[in-house]
C-alpha cells in the first residue's frame, strides 16, 4: 500500500498524541450501536436491491448496469447540488470520497452536507452493486461510517460547549475522532472484520491515538450486527447466487482438485451476448 501510494497518509486526522482516551471510551458505545443499526439496514437494503435486480429478466443483460450507472449519476448530481445549496458542494458520492472525508476530519462540513452525502452514498452503492456496476464495498463503507461519525461529532461538539466533556480539545479534534470511530464501527458491522478495519484505518491515517475506543466500538458493532443478521454479507451474497459453502466438500489438501466436483463452483445461468 505505502509502496504504491507513498508514505504520506491518505487522510490527515491530526488528533495529537495527548488526546484523552477516557471520554471516547464512553462515546464508542453509542457509536457502535448506531453503526450496527445502520450497517444492518445497509446490508438488508443491499440484499433486497440485488434480489430485485436479479429478478428483472425483461431487460437485456447489458442494459441493467447502464441503467444503474445512470441512476447513480443522477443521485451523485443531486447530492452535489444539494450540498452546494449549503455552500459546500461535494462530489463524494461520485468518487471514493477522500476529499469529503478530509473535510469532515477538519470540521469543514455542516451537518446537512454530511447527512446528504451519507444518504446519497448509501443509495448509490445499493443501485450500483445490485445492477452489476463496477466497485466494491470497502471504501463506500468507510465513507458512510465517516459521515455517521461526523454527525455524531457535531452533536458532541454542541454538547461540549454546554457541558465540557473533552478538556483542551478543539472542535476539529472532536470531529476527527468521531469520524475515525464511525469509519471503524460501520466497517466492522457491514464487512464483519473488526480488526481488519483497525489495520485499514491505521494505514490510511497513520494515527494510533484512539486504539482502545476503536476496538471497543468495532466489537460492539460487530456483535450487534451479528445478532441482527446472523449470516454475514458475503455469505449471503453467495447464497443469493446459489453457492453454499457449508455444502462444499471438506478440504483435502493437494487432492482437492481431483475430488472437488465442478458443479460446486460452476454457474448454470450463463449470460451470452452476440459477437
Feature names for model-found ranges:
Residues 1-275:
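Alpha-helical transmembrane segments and immediately membrane-proximal extracytoplasmic
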